[in-house]
Amino acid sequence: MKLQVNGTAHEVAVSLTVRGLLDQMGFGEKPVVVELNQRALFPREHASTELSDGDVLEIVQISAGG
């Protein structure tokens, strides 16, 4: 399955949820904002949202600064 993540092509061998992709990419439980095909997802949707071939994602890690 081919995905575009933050403007870069990614290929994954199995179907995944957004949560599974975040885990594979090393985000774990870090706070992130995810946009899937130009639609922002609530964090509660990450585990139940299945990815499809050709999906476009933007993932932004939230960090605090001072």
Language-model-derived ranges and their functions:
Residues M1-G65:
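Ubiquitin-like/PB1-type beta-grasp interaction modules and other compact soluble beta-rich domains
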